[in-house]
Amino acid sequence: FFKQKTAYEIGVRLVGSEMCIRDSSGPMREFLNSPDPTEAAALAGVHRRVARGLGLLATLDVGVRPEVSEEPVILAANHRSMADLFLAAAIFSEWGWPIRPLVAGSYFDRPGIGGLLRRLRCIPVRGSEALDIATEVMADGWSVAVMPEGRVVPEAEWAPTGVGTARPGVGRLALARGRPVVAIGVSGTERFWPRGRNLPRISPWRRFPLRIRHEVLGVMVGDQPSVALEEIMAGITRCIAATESPSELFD
């Protein structure tokens, strides 16, 4: 993880940037079961500023936003880089969708990055409480984003299939809540901000390409979290392949 001063500086630059790269692709989404509009609008503002800052360093291809008929939903993505957090905020800004990621609680205790996570309304997760916390947040109308691998995965582990070993929590959450699941595949962040580096790679001559694709998996059925997890990870794997394929995978 990066040094404390570096984390603070990156947070200020990404959240405080006023340079406009591009506007959101549409208005904020509203559903019958939506979060408090004032809180959602405040979060959307932070997402926009992060998107503008990240746009100075990388090109973003986030695709069309998922077509879901109701909220809240569970978004599940792979995790190759610390840049995934900032890319997530940019994605949610582009989609006009106030979504709250679950993040390991230990990061909130670190100066600089902890403040940024709170401004992004990330949900701190400590141990086995993840399912209860996510359930409470979704009951208030918020969609949540999770990274089933639970850590930044080394390339040696994800290279064979595109993903690392996942933890079972997302399978339990999907079955317990009975909400639609959207699989997301991310590529490019591992080159932009490689695992183990204190800073992303910054070049004055080019911006790193970051690409995501998604697939709406729908509601998980059955009573076996391991089966639900397997289906979710298979969806993420297909989406990762689509980021590197001429044919694009969308629902």
Put a short name on every predicted segment.
Residues 91, 116, 136, 172-176:
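Hydrophobic/aromatic ligand-binding patch that stacks against planar heteroaromatic rings
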Residues 71-77, 142-150, 179:
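Generic beta-sheet signal
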Residues 43, 47-79:
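Helix-to-loop junction immediately C-terminal to a conserved catalytic motif
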Residues 158-227:
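A cross-family acyltransferase "interaction/gating" segment
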